[in-house]
């Protein structure tokens, strides 16, 4: 089996773009590394013990599951006409799988590379039967929930120059229409993942509640 370190180095070349401050933007690369590590941990949980899993292919797919994003973001910034404007999430998955194939040909055995591409294409597919695709989906969803999810949202709000009020109100709207309950119910394949997500949502809820209190000064004792 090939070593994962050279693949990580290739992924870094693909996933690191330029930030609005013209610095290296490692956001997507860091996300993909986290997803890779969580996917590996989930693949070893008791629920998945009977599944046949190619852990190397799973790790590579986790690294490249959003490989198209950096290129699409560059197109948005530099081109007046670009396909990214009309690309669906499904399109992005297929584009990412193509990029993985292009960049890893000769680095990963052909049959394993085909599996990597199929894992990427079938991720977040409710009808997926591929074990690795289920695990990748759960790991990716977990990275969008809890403290990491709050950090991702606040990062976006800061980059867009938006106020704390908007972040707090967006969270409150999600709570009002049961957004988290629906996600916990619908997006996870493994009960292990669902339990982790429940704990993460609870921690995020506590943080956002405190953020809202501090924003309004409600944590200051009455005289």
Place the predicted regions along the sequence by residue:
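Short alpha-helical hairpin
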Residues: 1-17, 67-68, 72
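Active-site flanking loop/helix segments enriched in acidic
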Residues: 8-36, 76-87, 188-192
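Alpha-helix C-capping/helix-to-loop hinge sites
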Residues: 18-22, 42-46, 70, 103, ...
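Active-site-proximal helix-loop elements at catalytic-domain edges
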Residues: 21-23, 98, 102-113
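Divalent metal-dependent phosphate-bond-processing catalytic cores, especially two-metal-ion Mg2+/Mn2+ enzymes
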Residues: 23-33, 37-52, 64, 125-223
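An active-site-proximal "capping" alpha-helix that borders the catalytic cofactor pocket
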Residues: 35-36, 40, 89-105
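Acidic/histidine metal-binding catalytic segments
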Residues: 47-60, 105-120, 132
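His-Asp-centered metal-binding catalytic motifs of divalent-metal-dependent phosphohydrolases/nucleases
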Residues: 53-81, 96, 117-126
């Amino acid at each position: 089996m090939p070593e994962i370190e050279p693949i990580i180095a290739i992924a870094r070349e693909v996933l690191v773009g330029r930030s609005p401050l013209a610095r290296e933007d490692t956001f997507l690369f860091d996300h993909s590394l986290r997803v890779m590590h969580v996917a590996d941990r989930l693949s070893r949980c008791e629920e998945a013990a009977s599944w046949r899993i190619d852990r190397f292919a799973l790790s590579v797919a986790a690294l490249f599951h959003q490989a198209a994003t950096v290129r699409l973001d560059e197109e948005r910034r530099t081109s007046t006409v670009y396909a990214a404007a009309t690309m669906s999430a499904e399109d992005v998955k297929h584009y990412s799988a193509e990029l993985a194939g292009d960049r890893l040909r000769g680095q990963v055995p052909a049959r394993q590379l085909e599996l990597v591409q199929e894992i990427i294409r079938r991720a977040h597919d409710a009808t997926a039967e591929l074990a690795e695709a289920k695990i990748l989906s759960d790991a990716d969803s977990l990275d969008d929930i809890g403290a990491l999810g709050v950090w991702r949202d606040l990062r976006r709000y800061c980059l867009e120059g938006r106020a704390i009020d908007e972040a707090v109100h967006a969270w409150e709207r999600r709570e009002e229409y049961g957004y988290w309950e629906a996600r916990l119910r619908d997006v996870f394949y493994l009960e292990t993942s669902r339990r982790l997500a429940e704990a993460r949502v609870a921690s995020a809820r506590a943080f956002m509640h405190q953020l809202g209190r501090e924003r309004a000064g409600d944590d200051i004792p009455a005289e």
